[in-house]
Regions:
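Bacterial Sec-dependent signal peptides at the C-terminal "C-region" and cleavage site
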Residues: 1-11
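His/Asp/Glu-rich mid-to-C-terminal helical/loop segments that flank catalytic regions of hydrolases
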Residues: 9, 277-298
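Extracytoplasmic/secreted proteins, especially bacterial periplasmic and envelope-associated proteins
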Residues: 12, 17, 21-24, 28, ...
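Acidic/His- and Gly-rich active-site-bordering loop/insert found
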Residues: 29, 83-113
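A non-catalytic alpha/beta surface segment that caps or lines the substrate-entry region
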Residues: 37-93
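Alpha-helical metal-binding/catalytic segments enriched in His/Glu/Asp
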Residues: 89, 105-166
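Metal-dependent peptidase/peptidase-like ectodomains
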Residues: 160-267, 271-273
């Protein structure tokens, strides 16, 4: 929240996030040029440089202690039995009243790369949707800062990599945090919010909320009340129970979504977290997860 919220219309800044700008970002970020953004590849380097350049354009500073945007890491990809060199991207807006307390917003910048037949997995929804949303959110925050309205707490925009290798970028950050985990009040994790699943064809303005009440009832209540006040999405909690069945990859299985995205490493450090998600679809981890299928108007 920003200072002087009783006289500030926060929707002014929220409305700066437009379908047009999201689409412009996506058609670059999820293009063939980025070669599926696999961690440890040249495509990932293109992705991290794109993010850095966009943050510099909007005036949001790097989130490393030396002011840099890149957190280099060498991580072991167990599924492939090899180490890879990869990078998280961090951008930072300092808070006003409680600058040492931190809200961390996450999405993963990587995807699964190129198939053996040369087809590119563009990863528009997974997780170009979360990545581009974060860029636009950061710009909205910075517009408020430019008007003299800093958030009460500091905000770290953390684009983690190697999520597709096993949540490795968020694990690395949790073990090597730029800001103390004990000062991190919450994590908001955004992964796959660009499509409409089969359960919501009749009401596309929805969002799955996962984990909001696991460590903090306050976080759950604030999330619900802010939704009711400003955007009025249908908040669907069915997957908050990890045992709820989902049809995925050709079969029914327990969803376990609470354990399958980058918020997990914050939760494991006792940081309350919410996972924002719109569900899976037939293009999940396929070359058909492309920018033209994203619902930018949602």
């Amino acid at each position: 929240s920003c200072q002087n919220t009783e006289v500030v219309d926060v929707t002014l800044y929220g409305n700066s996030i437009t379908a047009k700008e999201l689409k412009e970002h996506m058609y670059i970020y999820a293009s063939d040029e980025f070669q599926g953004r696999e961690a440890g590849t040249a495509g990932e380097i293109l992705a991290i440089n794109y993010l850095k350049n966009e943050y510099e354009k909007i005036g949001v500073k790097g989130g490393m202690q030396n002011g840099d945007y890149f957190m280099p890491m060498n991580v072991y990809a167990g599924r492939e039995r090899r180490n890879i060199d990869s990078f998280n991207v961090l951008a930072f807006i300092k808070g006003d009243e409680k600058p040492d307390e931190l809200l961390v917003i996450t999405s993963h910048l990587d995807h699964v790369g190129v198939n053996k037949d040369g087809s590119v997995n563009n990863g528009a929804d997974d997780d170009g949707s979360g990545t581009t949303a974060m860029l636009e959110m950061a710009e909205a925050f910075q517009l408020a800062v430019n008007d003299g309205l800093r958030p009460k707490r500091s905000v770290l925009f953390l684009h983690v990599s190697a999520e597709e290798k096993g949540l490795l970028g968020s694990e690395y950050y949790s073990k090597n945090p730029t800001y103390p985990m004990e000062d991190t009040v919450a994590n908001l994790n955004i992964d796959m919010i660009g499509r409409v699943d089969d359960l919501h064809k009749d009401n596309p303005n929805y969002l799955y909320i996962i984990g909001s009440d696991k460590l903090s009832q306050d976080l759950h209540d604030v999330n619900q009340s802010m939704n009711d006040k400003y955007v009025n999405l249908e908040l669907d909690y069915r997957y908050n129970d990890p045992t709820t069945l989902v049809f995925e990859m050709g079969r029914m299985r327990e969803n376990n979504y609470y354990y399958r995205s980058d918020h997990l490493h914050f939760v494991n450090n006792n940081v309350p977290a919410i996972f924002y998600f719109n569900g899976t679809h037939e293009d999940y981890h396929r070359p058909t997860d492309t920018a033209d299928k994203i619902r930018y108007d949602l």
